[in-house]
Amino acid sequence: RTIEEGFAKIQTYDQIVPSIRDSEIRSEMRIVSREAHVLFEELYESPRDVKKVRDFFTFYLDSLLSISEKYADLERRGAQVQLDTKNQLISNLKMIGQKLKQQQTLLLEGDTVDLERELLTIEKVLTQETEQRKQEESYRHDPF
């Protein structure tokens, strides 16, 4: 459910992006959108991982949507946005994009750890089976 609600927010965000007239801001927003979609693909594949990226859902996603809606509204009403405000928005979008990449890395690291654990378990079982076979063979050849 958390994933679906978050994805709905990204879809709302995606609808805002084309309406942004400032090409630099629109470009940064598209980058953030791409990174968010990659993260959601990972989460749909492994829904249990949502706990690992909880801060994305509890803070970043709502903030992203809020600042985007406010900026789009200002543009729509013809307001002149100060250069400092524009630069701050771009900076925040870049930071959110980086945070999304970090969240993706966090999920991949978890998958890597799971794979390593599974490989170690398989290796241990195979080693034990090999040792057991050796013992059984030695008993067959030398019962005493």
Q: What spans do the regions from the language model cover?
A:
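Membrane-proximal, non-transmembrane interface segments of integral membrane proteins
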Residues: 1-44
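Long amphipathic all-alpha helical oligomerization modules
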Residues: 41-53, 58-144
